[in-house]
Amino acid sequence: MTTRKIQQIIQGQPASDGAGVKLIRSLGSANHLRADPFLMLDAFSSENPDDYVAGFPSHPHRGFETVTYLLDGHMLHEDHLGNKGNLKSGGVQWMTAGRGIIHSEMPQQENGRMRGFQLWINLPAREKMKPAGYRDIQAEEIPTAPFADGSVKVIAGTYEGTKGPVQGGSTDPLYWDVQLNAGKTFEEKIPATHALYIYPFEGSVEIEDRVLKAHQGGVLGSGDTVSARAGKDGARFLVLAAKPLQEPVVQYGPFVMNTREEIEQAIRDYQNGVLAV
């Protein structure tokens, strides 16, 4: 057993996206910090409707996957394929942009708390131009596995025999929401083949003598085990792991490809109305 250590701490930065939705961006911030194959992680949380009510009007994507996990609130997804999905508290929308998708995510509430995450996962070159896809995962489809000192909500991958609704795929992702009691330790094997990113959003965790506070992401190094100890107030954190692609990444806004020429083609396709054909 080799326990992973934190290689890099990424401080989440205030940002806005869509039509002015306020959020905290760790991966994918202005300095383009990434953790292959993870391109971006945004966290949003507010009870002020001015921070979120304008939502994310219609916009394009190409070349990667987006995962929206809503802790609290209600959003409506619509796309050019005719998909329409209500994302409610505890639910997930897993969207594969592939060769192209044009979609919107709009709040369906005028007050109350809106809280959640959006994660971008890169696709390998061979899959960047595959047909777009969309999956709406309701809260009741996502299992929670209790253990002595907390619980794990399993969105993707498997935790101690509990399988999440998302399995396999080119990067074989793990996406866990871990709740850990104060002063207790979460220890679990993570495939040595996978990159690992830990993101606490409540409380703090200590990993091999380094502390991650809320909205500080930790890129962990090589090994096959993660060991995280909750601080005095307990902790809730995301465990994100996946196989690195080790391919060139060229990004321009909502397009993520392997070369500048492919980005230029994506822009032309969008301008000519054929991005998502």
Name every feature range the model reports, one short phrase each:
Residues 1-277:
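Jelly-roll (double-stranded beta-helix
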